[in-house]
Design a protein with these regions (language model features):
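Short, Lys/Arg-enriched N-terminal segments with co-localized hydrophobic residues
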Residues: 3-28
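Cytoplasmic juxtamembrane regions at transmembrane-helix boundaries
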Residues: 157-170
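Residue-level marker of positions within ordered structural domains that often coincide
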Residues: 12, 57, 168
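Hydrophobic alpha-helical transmembrane segments of small proteolipidic membrane proteins, enriched
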Residues: 21-160
Length: 170
């Protein structure tokens, strides 16, 4: 055997772990197995709440804003684009949060296969299909947020152009 740091590799290149390392890995995987759905869906739920909150806030603001009350275009632009960056960040990252859940679900499926010692096609397919739901939830958050964001960007462009047209002669 050839010794490397704290782990050793036998002649068949199989990693060997001590009992404490195996228990630690099992504990982490069991923790993920029981909680990853709650964590991922919880994060996506919080993101959805912010999308809903900022969407309602922007709709109310855009319906009440008086563009003539602003002294310059920079002040108007700052007011009109408030919270749009948050919507952009959410629609950009929600699919990645979902993908993280899917990758973790696939890891758990492989872990379960390894612990069972055999290959059962039915359990693999069930595990993989359940893992994909996280990506679906991520897309479910991202796609409407993208549409809302683009609608607001268009609204901001129209209001800024209206401001420029009214103040061009001054």
């Amino acid at each position: 055997m050839y010794y490397f740091s704290y782990n050793y590799i036998d002649i068949n290149y199989q990693y060997s772990y001590n009992h404490a390392q195996i228990l630690k890995i099992r504990g982490i995987m069991e923790l993920l197995k029981h909680n990853i759905d709650y964590i991922i869906i919880g994060i996506l739920g919080v993101m959805s709440f912010f999308v809903l909150w900022y969407t309602i806030e922007r709709i109310i603001f855009y319906s009440r804003v008086n563009i003539n009350s602003y002294k310059n275009i920079e002040e108007l632009d700052g007011a009109l684009t408030k919270n749009l960056t948050t919507l952009y960040i959410i629609y950009s990252n929600a699919p990645y949060i979902g993908l993280l859940g899917t990758v973790t679900g696939i890891m758990i499926t492989f872990y379960d296969m390894g612990m069972a010692g055999g290959i059962d096609t039915k359990s693999i397919m069930i595990g993989l299909s359940l893992a994909l739901k996280a990506t679906a939830f991520g897309l479910l958050v991202a796609i409407p947020t993208l549409m809302i964001y683009n609608g607001f960007v268009r609204k901001v462009d129209v209001m800024i152009n209206r401001y420029k047209a009214k103040n061009a002669s001054k």
